[in-house]
Amino acid sequence: MGSFKVIYQGVDIYPKVSVGHCWADGRAWGATDSLTIDFGDTRNLWDRWHPEVGDEIAVEDGAARSGTMYVSSVVPQSSRFTVTAYAAPQSARERRSKSWERVHLSQLLAEVADRHGMGCETYGVEDHEYQYVEQDNESDLAFLDRRLTYEGAGLIVYDGRLVAYSGEWLEAQGATGELSVTPGVDYEFRDDSARSYGGCTVTDGTTSATWSAGEGKTLVRVVPERIGSVGEAERWAKGLLRAANREATRMVIRTDSMLRGYAAGSVVDLSASAAASWDGPAVVSRIRHDYYDSKAKVWLTRPLGY
């Protein structure tokens, strides 16, 4: 751990503290990036430093970087402290209600980012306009995740930025590296593609549309939001079909190295002599960097192609 750093409130404290378990989870969808770290505390230093919820913390080990995280809990135990932090400040996880008329997706993203002092980036996401949008007693992150899911997109929160990306755009990106699955590698995979949906019908009770990707049963979703047009319903049906099918085929690999150059939301070229059907591109849906043991655990899915 020669290049390892723990940056707390802008200061590298690693030379002054001992670190036990430390891992960061990055996710391309479904949850916010998180950090869990155990500090040895035989001299009771943490209590003197008065750690507080909302403090900023980050860990680094070469190219592997958690990005800025916000402390959610500090749990003292015998001779140690366990700190849990998330990539979004607590305010972004608090429930709120609001409505908009004639608003673009980019405006929703920018407003939420500004409210929490964060930046905002989009990749391949079309800036659709909505006639009416309502956020009803839900957190800003849950609200944005839902709206982006309708549009076949996802949300990553990393290092003080909201990153919205199109699923199709992500799958079209070149591989950032290669992973090999050879005999002896610790892996497991599951293929539920036979139970995937072939299409999706979306309705708000008044406006409906169906989008089909091929053979298979049809998913029916009744959404609480007002759908502005048949075209919008078709887009949402496609987006919800993506969300329902994107983990139908998945693999988990455990490695003896950190995989420092890999991140959730990237594409890798999988060479799988032990599971040849997986040869080719795969999407990193989640990755856990274990900074203490210098290992990684990678969750992969296969590109959907729509």
State what each model feature region is:
Residues M1-A92, G184, R250:
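Assembly/oligomerization scaffold segments
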Residues M1-Y8, R48, V157-D159, S166-S294:
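Acidic, small/polar-enriched beta strand-loop surface segments
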Residues I7-Q9, D25, D38-G40, E60-G62, ...:
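A structural detector for beta-sheet-dominated domains
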Residues I37, S97-C120, Q135-D159, V202, ...:
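Amphipathic, non-transmembrane alpha-helical segments in extracytoplasmic/periplasmic proteins
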Residues W46-V59, R93-V103, L179, A263-S271:
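Extended Gly/Ser/Thr-rich low-complexity repeat segments
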Residues E60-A85, D269-S294, W299:
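Short beta-strand and beta-hairpin "edge-sheet" elements
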Residues R80, A87-A88, T122-S193:
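Short beta-strand-centered interaction patches in the first periplasmic/extracellular domains
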Residues K98-R102, L300-Y306:
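Glycine- and charge-enriched low-complexity intrinsically disordered segments
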